[in-house]
From Swiss-Prot:
Protein's organism: Thiobacillus denitrificans (strain ATCC 25259 / T1)
Topological category with respect to the lipid bilayer: Peripheral membrane protein
Annotated GO MF terms: ATP binding; proton-transporting ATP synthase activity, rotational mechanism
Name under which the protein is recorded: ATP synthase epsilon chain 1
Subunit structure: F-type ATPases have 2 components, CF(1) - the catalytic core - and CF(0) - the membrane proton channel. CF(1) has five subunits: alpha(3), beta(3), gamma(1), delta(1), epsilon(1). CF(0) has three main subunits: a, b and c.
Amino acid sequence: MAMTMRLDVVSVEGSLFSGIVESVVAPAEMGAVGIYPGHAPLLTRLKPGAVRLRIPYQAEEEIVYVSGGMLEVQPYKVTLLADVAMREKALAEADLHAEKHRAEAVLKDRVTADAYARLEVELAKALTYVQGVQKLRRRGF
């Protein structure tokens, strides 16, 4: 059996993934970082992009798109705290474009500071998802 580690992916909306993985590849601020069981402790910021999860007994990697956040690595536990995150399978491009345009339109109007902050998060989420769909299309999905 391959060595494994625990991974928790959490966004402001809640837990997205919690389980055992063989490896994680994430878009860190200084470039992609590959994490395997026994990795040295690490704390880094994440850039927007795809996080690839290798799950035991699954033929294909699972992909989670993040808009940024933090990554904490311990030898056998990885915690990914994302501003916004979504699984690859949940992306629907048409809905995402509509959400993006709605958030942009509302941001142009005068709104309270709280509403503005919420809309910025929604816009970042929509942009991340649209980028994810575009990457999937380039990969032939």
